[in-house]
């Protein structure tokens, strides 16, 4: 039994398919590990996974999907490095360990010019109703703080905000609307697959 807080258990049917594809991918005579990332076969794999993600997440047409190397913590530098306009224009809603860790990394990029609201004491989603005055254009939060046991699902309680959400431990486990979401990310190993890739 695998009850690890990190990599999740992989279903036997998936392990069997992986084993088969490692030996001979779709009876092509070569292993899936030997595919060039520029090959048509590999591009078909990526396209198929993207199509399934769009369906799973009810993703609107004006969003795109990125498959990135490494774990979700890499997003702590990837996002600020690629979005310098967030400096002075992002607030953090802190509900636990992972949000605090991300805040520290963001502060390095943004010269500590980040507003943060600690919601860790006596947390409930009703607290969000008192945060309508958050003035910054972007708001960052962690949807499921696994160490503290705090989960946020009703993102609509934060109206008219561009949310950036770490959904590493609960992505694809419930439905949510995209009306006020700009960017979500998740390490694959909790709910989606094996370690080493972030969506």
PLM feature segments, named:
Residues 28-78, 95-97, 105:
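Conserved N-terminal alpha-helix of the aminotransferase class I/II PLP-enzyme fold
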